[in-house]
Amino acid sequence: MDFSQLGGLLDGMKKEFSQLEEKNKDTIHTSKSGGGMVSVSFNGVGELVDLQIDDSLLEDKEAMQIYLMSALNDGYKAVEENRKNLAFNMLGNLGNFAKL
């Protein structure tokens, strides 16, 4: 193993990770609940970027809370799953390390 190439490999991975993070920011994950009465959208870094609530729910606070929690939880899970997949893809590239 040639440790002199390790720095270059790490720099390359850091650059690739930054590019993936930037690209991931543009990815949108949308979750709906209550048959579409509530819709939330997160970008790939977990920021809530859109929230839609059907007007009919404005008079039913309890239902709105339940649907909001459900949609938010599903959206959060989608973002986390996407992050995990990106991390596994990055780790897959560590196979290049063994070739050094």
Swiss-Prot record:
Presence of the UniProt keyword DNA-binding in the record: yes
A GO MF term: DNA binding
Cross-referenced SUPFAM superfamilies: YbaB-like (SSF82607)
UniProt xrefs under InterPro entries: YbaB-like_sf, YbaB/EbfC
GO CC terms, sorted: bacterial nucleoid; cytoplasm
Main localisation: cytoplasm
Family classification: Belongs to the YbaB/EbfC family.
Name assigned to this protein: Nucleoid-associated protein HPSH_00175
Key words, A-Z: Cytoplasm, DNA-binding
Role: Binds to DNA and alters its conformation. May be involved in regulation of gene expression, nucleoid organization and DNA protection.
Superkingdom of this protein's organism: Bacteria
Organism from which the protein derives: Helicobacter pylori (strain Shi470)
Subcellular localization: Cytoplasm, Nucleoid
UniProt key word Cytoplasm: yes
Subunit text: Homodimer.
